[in-house]
Regions:
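Conserved beta-ketoacyl condensing-enzyme motif
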Residues: 48-138, 149, 273-289
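Glycine/charged-rich beta-loop-alpha catalytic/anionic-binding loops adjacent to active sites
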Residues: 79-80, 110-114, 136-148, 188-193, ...
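Active-site-adjacent elements of ketosynthase-type condensing enzymes
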Residues: 124-130, 176-196, 223-240, 286-294, ...
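Short, well-ordered amphipathic alpha-helical segments that serve as non-catalytic structural scaffolds
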Residues: 49-50, 91-106, 161, 205, ...
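Condensing-enzyme catalytic core mediating Claisen C-C bond formation in acyl metabolism
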Residues: 1-87, 173, 188-257, 261, ...
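Claisen-condensing/thiolase-fold acyl-transfer catalytic domains that form or cleave C-C bonds
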Residues: 2, 87, 120-121, 141, ...
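Active-site glycine-rich loop that binds ribose-phosphate moieties when present
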Residues: 140-141, 147, 154-161, 178-204
Length: 356
C-alpha cells in the first residue's frame, strides 16, 4: 500500500515571560539550610547546564499571592492540586495559543482538519484541546485527540498520531500542539533528590502543522521501545499538592547502557550511520544528554541543539523535543536525522526525519 509522505511545515514556540530559575535555586537552598545537602545542591545547580527556566508564575510580586513564584514557593501549606489546576486551566490555553500564533507567522494554517494536543501537567474538561479549538474558531466538527500524562515523549506520540492521520488521509491538515506548565508542580518536600528533580523543569509550548505537502521536514518512520525492569526509574503521579516526579539517578546509566545494545541500536538507527545524522534528543537533563552522547559515541557538536534548548529553557516535558527540532530545521548539518525522547517506562520514543 502506497501511503502519503508526511511533513512538518514549521514549528512555532512560546514560553512565559517570567524567568524563575535563579529564584528557584535561592528558594531551594533556603529549604536545606546550611547543610552538606545544600552545598551539593548548589554545586549540581551550577553544573546543570541550565541558565533560564520560564514560568507562568510571576517572578516577583509585592503581594506574594499564590500566583506569584515567590508566593507559590513560600506558601504554607503548599497550594493544593486543585489550586494548581485552576492556574493550568487559565494559563495553558494562552501559552498554547501563543505558540500557534508563532506558527501562523511561518505557515498557512487554513483548512485545519484535525487537532492533536499533548499535555501532561494538567487536567480539565472540557479538555484543553476543546478550549484551543474554540479559541481558534476551528470547526465544531474538527477531529480532536488529547495525548495526556505520557511525560517527556508525549510530543513524539502526538506527532505519531498526526503522521498516521495524514498517511491514511492525504488531504488532512493536522495541527499538533504540546503545552506544559511544569512549574505549577513545585514540590512540597525539601529532600535533595526532590529539589534537584524540580530544578530541571520549565514551562513552554510548541505547535506544528503536519500534512502531505511536498515541502518541509519529512517524517519517515516512528519507533518505540521499553527497557526491561525499568518501570520504577521515572514515575509521574498525582499528589495532594501537585504532581510528584520520581527521577532515579540510575536513569542516565541505564540509557547509556541500552544505547550500546544491538536491539535498541537496530530500532533506533535502522542501518543508518549515527555520525551522519542530525540528532534531536530530548534534553531531560545534562546527564541524560551526556548519556546519549556516550552511548552512541557521538561527536559533542551533534547534541548542540539539545544543550542549547536545555540552557535557555530547561526541560519543558513534551514541548521540548519540538524546540530542539526547530533548531535543527533552522540549521541542519545533515540530510537526515533522528528525534528521540525518554520517559516513564523507562521507554524511548522517536522518529526518523529527512529534508524534503
Amino acid at each position: 500500500v502506497q501511503h502519503a509522505a508526511t511533513h512538518i511545515q514549521a514549528i512555532g514556540k512560546a514560553v512565559p515571560e517570567h524567568d524563575v530559575h535563579l529564584d528557584y535555586i535561592r528558594w531551594a537552598e533556603e529549604q536545606m539550610g546550611q547543610s552538606r545537602e545544600r552545598a551539593l545542591f548548589t554545586r549540581m545547580a551550577r553544573r546543570s547546564g541550565i541558565d533560564h527556566r520560564w514560568s507562568v508564575l510571576a517572578r516577583d510580586e509585592a503581594s506574594r499571592s499564590a500566583t506569584s513564584a515567590e508566593g507559590f514557593f513560600r506558601a504554607s501549606p503548599a497550594p493544593s492540586t486543585a489550586r494548581r489546576m485552576e492556574i493550568y486551566t487559565r494559563e495553558a490555553p494562552e501559552l498554547a495559543l501563543a505558540a500557534i500564533a508563532d506558527l501562523a507567522r511561518q505557515a498557512e494554517l487554513g483548512g485545519i482538519t484535525h487537532l492533536v494536543v499533548a499535555s501532561c501537567t494538567g487536567f480539565v474538561a472540557p479538555g484543553i484541546d476543546q478550549i484551543i479549538a474554540r479559541r481558534l474558531g476551528l470547526s465544531p466538527a474538527i477531529e480532536r485527540t488529547l495525548v495526556g500524562f505520557m511525560g517527556c515523549y508525549a510530543g513524539i506520540a502526538a506527532l505519531r498520531v498526526a503522521h498516521h492521520i495524514v498517511r491514511s488521509d492525504p488531504q488532512a491538515r493536522v495541527l499538533v500542539v504540546a503545552v506544559e506548565l511544569c512549574s505549577l508542580h513545585l514540590p512540597s518536600g525539601s529532600g535533595l533528590d526532590v529539589l534537584l528533580g524540580a530544578m530541571q523543569f520549565g514551562d513552554g509550548a510548541a505547535a506544528t502543522l503536519v500534512c502531505a505537502g511536498p515541502s518541509g521536514t519529512r517524517l519517515d518512520r516512528f519507533f518505540c521501545t521499553t527497557l526491561p525492569a525499568s518501570d520504577a526509574l521515572i514515575q509521574w503521579t498525582i499528589g495532594d499538592t501537585g504532581f510528584d516526579m520520581i527521577l532515579s539517578g540510575e536513569v542516565p546509566a541505564r540509557i547509556a547502557q541500552a544505547l550500546q545494545e544491538p536491539e535498541l541500536r537496530d530500532v533506533l538507527l535502522a542501518g543508518q550511520d549515527a555520525a551522519m545524522l542530525d540528532w534531536a534528543v530530548h534534553p531531560g537533563g545534562r546527564t541524560i544528554v551526556d548519556a546519549v552522547e556516550g552511548g552512541l559515541a557521538l561527536d559533542p557538536a551533534a547534541l548542540g541543539p539539545s544543550r542549547s534548548v536545555l540552557a535557555r529553557f530547561g526541560n519543558m516535558s513534551s514541548a521540548t523535543i519540538l524546540f530542539v527540532l526547530a533548531e535543527i530545521m533552522a540549521r541542519p548539518r545533515h540530510a537526515a536525522g533522528i528525534a528521540m525522547a525518554f520517559g516513564p517506562g523507562l521507554a524511548a520514543e522517536g522518529f526518523a526525519f529527512s529534508r524534503a
